[in-house]
Amino acid sequence: LARGQRVIFTTTTKIWQPAQQAFDLMLLAPDLTQALLQLQARTDWRSACVVAGADPAAAEIGVLAETRFLERDSVNHMPVLPHKMLGYAPDAICTALAYSPSHCQWVIEADGARGALLKAPDAHEPMIPACVDGVVVVANRDVIGQPLARPRVHRPEIVARLAGLALGEVMTPQAFMRVITHPQGGLKSLPPNAVRGLLLTGSPCDVPMVAGVFDWVMTVDD
């Protein structure tokens, strides 16, 4: 946005419905290609959220003017409403990119942690489109020094195996980075030519970096 480009946000999983002020436009469209054609025809937006629709397993979607928010998203502090929205299959996103408006960047949420500080992916995760040219791995350093257990850790059994710890053991900086840099952890299913970024949130602390794993590292201190 700061460079004058447009941004489209979507997901391959489920997200909380962004509140009205989070984006210039929000489109609910089962067909992503049709949604992009609509965006091409409009000039009244710089940021847009595009989702397939409401999650039928969740409560009925509320109106966008609703003012009852959940806590803001823990990573980007985006205000959200208490309704889950469905995204698109990774292949559908890659197919639809041919219809993307010009001078437009995409942000695609491809995995979720159910509000936990750290997670490891299950067999079907993460759902990263093969066509993306960059992937950002996100983890919260506040899990360091805490027991390896729910609710701080999502899929703790898998995290424990990758970290080399037992369930309930204290998460160390070394174990934290083992999960993030493991081929079945933070590096799972990354497209081979994609730029690899690491975003560390939470309280500042020293973590051992492994050279050559990520192309860039950014910290956001809470």
Feature annotation, model-predicted:
Residues 19, 74, 208:
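Short acidic, gly/pro-rich beta-turn/loop elements at beta-sheet edges
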Residues 14, 28, 82-105, 110-221:
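Conserved catalytic-core segment of NTP-binding enzymes
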Residues 2-60:
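N-terminal phosphate/diphosphate-binding loop that engages ATP/GTP or pyrophosphate donors
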Residues 35-88, 95, 101-104:
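Ligand-binding beta-strand-loop-alpha-helix segment within the catalytic cores
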Residues 10, 64, 107-108:
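Structural recognition of the conserved hydrophobic beta-strand(s) that form the central parallel beta-sheet
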